[in-house]
Amino acid sequence: MNNRAYALDALRGYAIITMVLSATIVTQVLPGWMSHAQTPPPDHIFNPSLPGITWVDLVFPFFLFAMGAAFPFSIGKRAEKGDSKLKLIYEAVKRGVQLTFFAIFIQHFYPYVLSSPQDIRAWLLAILCFAVLFPMFMRIPLKMPDWAHTGIKIAAYGIAVIMMLTTSYADGRTFSLYFSNVIILLLANMAIFGSALYIFTMHNRWLRLGVLLLLMAVILGRGVSH
């Protein structure tokens, strides 16, 4: 029996397509509603006093919602198969660490980070970064023992580390663990803490709601002066 939530799949697909679109469109020649509301064209300088919201502001929250809404399907299915909470937490932490590495790795290999203006070397390194991601995150569709698949992944991570440590960057920049893609880093946090919240409140919706209300109170109250 197919228990997929097609509406959730559709929302996730829409969010991915529009995230790619919003990151690649030439916003300098398009109207303001094609950019973030607080970073209007042509300069795209952040101005928090500007009111409003555009579709560009909504696509990433849509993806986060779809990701969180999928937890009962992915985690719940594994729990029904008998996986312990410890194993579920391990998988969540592993996924979060992988996403964190991904966020750091790709941020260091944007062409504009490698050289200014961009040259052939920068684009070739960016393409190499893209190529290394495949053995890092996909399972090679060949019949091999598990140790071979693991070895390929470890080798890919090793190549990525060597690339980050030995590459020279534009404007005197050097490798830094704090230089990362904030969007992917948010997904990594969601993968760890969102999964952990669901795992420990899987059978108690009221406890989950209480934790969410507590988080909401902390977020809303952080800017209140004493």
Language-model features: locations:
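Alpha-helical transmembrane segments and their immediate juxtamembrane cytosolic regions
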Residues: 1-226
